[in-house]
Amino acid sequence: MFASVGVHGPELSPTAALILDVLLLGAATLLLLQDKRMTRHQGVLLLSFVAVVAVLRVVMASLPNVQPVTVAVLLAGASLGARRGVAFAILVTMLSNSVLGDGYWTLFQAAGWSLIAAVGSRANLMEGDRLLLGRATMFAAVLALPFGLVTNMSLIGGGVGLAQLPALVWTGLPFDLSHALGNVVVMLWTGPLMLRMLLPVDVPDATAIPGVEADVQLV
């Protein structure tokens, strides 16, 4: 997965990079706005977790191909559904890349993590509110490989032709396997905690609590 070690595809002009960022941000915003079931509290929770995971990715950037984002987007898809999971994946990619480096590769990283979020929404990784840790760990490991394939596509056009892709994938396999191993460690270590951070806590309407409505009206 060369995109994580500084090898990237075509360089974008500032205007093209801005257009790409606007399109990605617009896609994430549209996905969230279309989700009529999402409450304001859930929206704040989602954006807060975006910030937490983005910071984690930046802090762990020195560890080759250890990607806490992969586990986070998989669990976001499993607990929040495909729409919110994909929006989460896009926003985390954009926010963390604003520090690590933004460019053409951002599109492919966002696409790879969005794919993982979509798979997570269909993978039956939860039983009620409980994480099926063994199943989730298996998916986290296996999905490192298609993520590596998607991100390697960002190299096409940057001096690399489509015919060279198989050799590129083979050469990058050790990076993808280290990503898979990292996903196993991150899932076993932090998976249940991440899920608790993602699951919304029922916050009752203040006016529905006996005695609160009168107090609110007096203020």
Each language-model region and where it sits:
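Generic hydrophobic alpha-helical membrane-segment signal
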Residues: 45, 69, 77, 85, ...
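Short hydrophobic/aromatic-rich motifs at helix boundaries and adjacent loops
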Residues: 23-24, 43-48, 88, 92, ...
